[in-house]
């Protein structure tokens, strides 16, 4: 155990490297195509803007940066996901060290996250949920510094504002964390009056708003399409009175189900669970606000609006659950008797990639089995036989047209539709439309083809 104690930082590094290697290799070796959300964001990235019809721009931006470096190499995007995950683990570990003052407990706080499938099984698909993770953890970490330290550093305020903006530009649900942190400070400044208001707090807001301005302008100019999509996904248009009860209950039960492996590890860690909660403990109050309040606000949203909260939306919400539960039960954890916990952790750590591997190999009708590269090769070969110019644009849904944009050598820009955009396109550029083969065949003015039940209309310059 002394060796274990002395080498905690080394163990943490080994753990995150193993996590990164395993969760980069397994999907790389078993998936034929990138997942839907990753292809979708890559499609947006081919034609970067300050927002898109479904989400803000951050996830597309990070993927496009990587594409410019590595091109259509699938492993790079699985690696990107894991980099985002281990950055979040790092800041969880850092905060745990500051709050728990015990490096072994801090390591356990991170190990517990391997029991939540949001941080392993679902991470190969880089999307807006994974994109939030590092910014969620960084905002919490620097918010703690502002909350805990007697002297507020300007640097910390700037960092909170900056990373809060990037988190919000990843997904609007990041706002639930920001509201929770705001309520924490409001509680202590205006009700408990144990924290004095500091004008440096305004720096956070100013940095946040300045960084959001381009997106807010884009949002206004595009009829708030991203917000409309988000509301549509909640099913608000067809809500009934029963939904105000049904969906919150479903939401609550799903969260319990997700956390069952986590609670099993807690039971293995703490032999006799005795709750001793001191609501005057500022560390505990901070952890409650950043862990439970965002989830509670989601539950209230579902109750008030009758909206359906989708499971994957909760991806970043549990990042600091390990820190909270270890803090609550720290006096009941015997660090000399961790064997059962470590066995449970190792079992879950290796079970998750094994299950992913099995599902990926045994099921052959998934999005990740799509022959995107082969289809792009066929399209490119046919294009070369019929046209002399380069494919500069692909038009269609994010999946079929997005795969073409990703796999074609020319990296054409993706458009859902080019209606009202014709004047902005390069007249020398070739266009490939994807869609319903029966419709495309009738209206295609160029070369029509059909691959895997999908129609392709190619319009370019002839010899």
Region roles according to the model:
Residues 166, 178-283, 294-295, 299:
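Transmembrane-lumen/periplasm boundary regions of multi-pass, lipid-linked membrane glycan transferases
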Residues 98, 139-156:
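Membrane-interface transmembrane helices that cradle and orient dolichyl/undecaprenyl
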Residues 47-48, 303-337:
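Hydrophobic/aromatic-rich transmembrane helices and adjacent perimembrane loops
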Residues 178, 365-422, 427-434:
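Short periplasmic/luminal acceptor-recognition loop of GT-C membrane glycosyltransferases, typified by
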Residues 121-132:
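Short acidic/glycine- and proline-prone juxtamembrane loop motifs at membrane-interface regions
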Residues 331-359:
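Signature aromatic-anchored transmembrane alpha helix within multi-pass, membrane-resident enzymes
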Residues 79-100, 115, 137-142:
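Transmembrane-helix motifs of polytopic, lipid-linked glycan transferases
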Residues 47, 156-172, 183, 208-210:
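Membrane-interface alpha helices of multi-pass inner-membrane proteins
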């Amino acid at each position: 155990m002394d060796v274990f104690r002395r080498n905690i930082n080394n163990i943490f590094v080994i753990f995150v490297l193993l996590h990164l290697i395993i969760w980069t290799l397994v999907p790389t070796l078993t998936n034929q195509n990138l997942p839907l959300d990753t292809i979708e964001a890559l499609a947006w990235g081919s034609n970067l803007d300050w927002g898109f019809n479904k989400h803000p721009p951050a996830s597309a931006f990070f993927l496009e940066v990587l594409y410019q470096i590595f091109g259509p190499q699938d492993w790079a995007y699985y690696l990107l996901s894991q980099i985002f995950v281990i950055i979040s683990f790092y800041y969880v570990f850092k905060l745990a060290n500051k709050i728990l003052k015990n490096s072994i407990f801090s390591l356990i706080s991170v190990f517990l996250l391997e029991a939540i499938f949001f941080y392993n099984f679902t991470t190969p698909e880089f999307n807006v949920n994974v994109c939030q993770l590092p910014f969620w953890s960084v905002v919490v970490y620097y918010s703690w510094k502002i909350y805990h330290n007697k002297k507020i550093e300007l640097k910390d305020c700037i960092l909170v504002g900056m990373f809060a903006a990037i988190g919000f530009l990843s997904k609007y649900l990041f706002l639930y964390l920001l509201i929770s942190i705001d309520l924490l400070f409001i509680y202590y400044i205006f009700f408990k009056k144990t924290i004095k208001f500091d004008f440096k707090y305004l720096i956070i807001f100013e940095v946040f708003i300045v960084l959001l301005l381009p997106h807010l302008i884009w949002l206004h100019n595009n009829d708030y399409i991203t917000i409309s999509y988000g509301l549509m996904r909640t099913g608000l248009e067809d809500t009934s009175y029963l939904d105000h009860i049904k969906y919150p209950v479903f939401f609550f039960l799903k969260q319990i189900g997700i956390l069952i492996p986590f609670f099993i590890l807690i039971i293995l860690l703490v032999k006799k669970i005795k709750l001793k909660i001191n609501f005057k403990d500022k560390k505990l109050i901070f952890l409650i606000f950043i862990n439970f309040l965002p989830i509670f606000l989601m539950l209230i949203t579902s109750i008030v609006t009758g909206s359906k909260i989708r499971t994957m939306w909760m991806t970043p919400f549990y990042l600091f659950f390990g820190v909270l539960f270890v803090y609550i039960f720290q006096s009941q954890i015997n660090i000399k008797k961790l064997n059962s916990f470590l066995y449970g952790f190792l079992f879950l750590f290796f079970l998750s990639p094994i299950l992913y591997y099995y599902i990926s190999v045994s099921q052959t009708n998934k999005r990740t089995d799509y022959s995107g590269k082969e289809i792009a090769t066929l399209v490119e070969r046919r294009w070369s036989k019929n046209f002399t110019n380069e494919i500069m644009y692909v038009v269609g849904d994010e999946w079929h047209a997005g795969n073409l944009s990703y796999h074609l050598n020319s990296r054409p820009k993706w458009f859902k539709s080019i209606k009202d955009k014709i004047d902005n396109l390069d007249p020398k550029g070739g266009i490939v439309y994807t869609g319903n083969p029966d419709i495309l065949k009738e209206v295609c003015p160029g070369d029509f083809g059909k691959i895997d039940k999908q129609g392709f209309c190619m319009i370019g310059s002839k010899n």
